[in-house]
Amino acid sequence: EIQIHPTVHNPSSTMVTEGARNAGAILINTSGKRFTNEVYYRDVVSAAILEQDQGFAYILMNQEIVDSNTNIQGYYKIGLLKKFDSIEEVAGFMKVDAAVLQDTLDKWNSYVADKNDPEFSSAFDWRRDLSQGPYYTIDVSPGIHHTMGGVVINTNSEVISTTGEIIPGLFAAGEVTGGVHGGNRVGGNAITDCLVFGMTAGKNSATYVGK
């Protein structure tokens, strides 16, 4: 089993934080339109992006959103996030009709004002009006974010063979193991998994070597 993250920059394979969409950024397809609830479940947003032309989309945000998140600022510093002074310039970069993109943005801003998204039922506790530039955009597509499958371990981080026996001296933790999370996982749980079983594997492997 794998978990897909919806917004990974291609070809750098840089994961673009959900903080961008959570802060009010929107997803735009190659027709210059929104196509999904940007902050819905990862698998749903990923599937929606893959259904778009060429299987990718653009994240569109403004200066206010960039200023709210140091990760986003980092994307700009390394050249992944592109900056534009107007929507017309953004449309040129995306190769979409500027009038269509402006209409998409006008609709979005009206949804923010009304706190209601009749198209995709987005939550509006953190939505932002995007009428003011400058604007920033980055192209993204879904990418593998976490693997839930792997070797079986016990509570001592010892790897178990296919016959159910402990393999002496072999320890494992994290994404190379399976059975810890089932078919999906929550980020905080995965961190706990890596920390707890990682420390256990390190301690027990050191003890084993010292025998």
Where are these regions (language model features)?
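Residues forming the flavin
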Residues: 1-211
